Amino acid sequence: MHRMLTAAAAAALALTLAPATARAEALFWSTQAKPVEESQAMREQVLAGFEGGVDYQGMDNGPWLTRIQAEMQAGTGTIAVLGGLHGDLSGLEAGLVDLSGADTAGIAPATLELGRLGTDEQKYVPWMQATYLMAANRKALEHLPEGADLNALTYDQLIAWATALNEATGGPKLGFPAGPQGLKHRFFQGFLLPAYTGSTVTQFRSAEAETAWEAFKTLWAQTNPASANYGFMQEPLLTEEVWVAFDHVARLGDAFNQRPDDFVAFPAPAGPKGRAFMPVIAGVAVMSTAPDMDQSMALVNYMLKPETQVATLRATNFFPVKDIPLPDDMPASVKAFGPAIAAMTGAPDALPALLPMGLGEMGGQFNQIYTDTFEQIVLGGRPVRDTLDAQAEALRALMVETGAPCWAPDAPSDGPCPVE
């Protein structure tokens, strides 16, 4: 037994010392670009130019986090660079090195600030971004309310537009991803509620939230009833079941790529508190246990090069975090979405509402509260006030159980994010 242990220890030591003799491929440990085709594109199109090679591993959050925690606990590891959403990296800051030396020129200051994770160090560097947008068939534009600016719509104008479309065409032409695979919860968390309340969590049961849900009920009355089954809005846009839709950019792309002349993209509407939107920010970070710090820093800077940012866009449909010109041969969807994202993130009333964070394995239950609220109020016809009061208690209990502090646009909290 002793001999076996000694052999195992020797083998482990040999693995540990291997980089000293021949620099190993950099292990890029990521929650992003998980599908087989995206991981392959990352390896072959994005990372192939990195000297020494990269072993890109995209995986689910559970195993991703388990290995990170094991390496942090051991004080030694093999991961060169972490890739993850803002919420994935939040909470790991104690084990991450300062990346202030990275080449971050061209990244918006507000986006860069997110990477500090509440510290005075650059704990991650923004790597790529996506968001959700509105899309419309050009045929719908002639029915826009008088004086409405497509790039600066309000929710009231969207309701008026949807109503006009219904009347002009003899059926509802607004579509919404409210099916089982749809991202409806992100609309409520990142768009509707913050636009009316300036909050995702704290003001969940407020009078302003009541107004938001009443407005959405009015909007739903002008929405194609098949929306209760929609997952990816590019499909009903292409069949013209709907003429106007909201969805994640990755779920709208096919419509623009197949029929580039027929569709336009534009920012989400604004409510009384601003033009709320949910930026999906992915970042790269380096653990203090990285086996070769020079290699890790080189890979971080490689990910920020303009040509790498463009290659990442081609591979993942995530947009550059740097303000760089895009090549002429980009897909039609990219050409349409780029200006719309810029108009939304740069709007004078822009109100970023981050993805939920600090919830760990309870993220699904958090999302379910927003989905249940929608289903009870909008589909089930339950009174708004009664529903909000009941769901607010479920939300408060979940925040207390997870201990998750508030995230933007809610004000920072010392303990669990309060539900007033």
Feature names for model-found ranges:
Residues 187, 214-295:
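Extracytoplasmic/periplasmic substrate-binding proteins
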Residues 26, 44-107, 142-145, 243-244, ...:
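Extracytoplasmic "Venus flytrap"/periplasmic binding protein-like
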Residues 121-127, 132, 156-202:
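Extracytoplasmic/periplasmic solute-binding protein
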Residues 134-139, 196, 279-293, 311:
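A bilobed periplasmic-binding-protein/Venus flytrap-type ligand-binding module shared by bacterial periplasmic
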Residues 100-107, 151, 174, 193-213, ...:
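Short, solvent-exposed loop/beta-turn-alpha elements that line the ligand-binding surface or hinge
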Residues 315-376, 404-420:
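Long, aromatic- and glycine/proline-rich binding clefts that accommodate carbohydrate-like moieties
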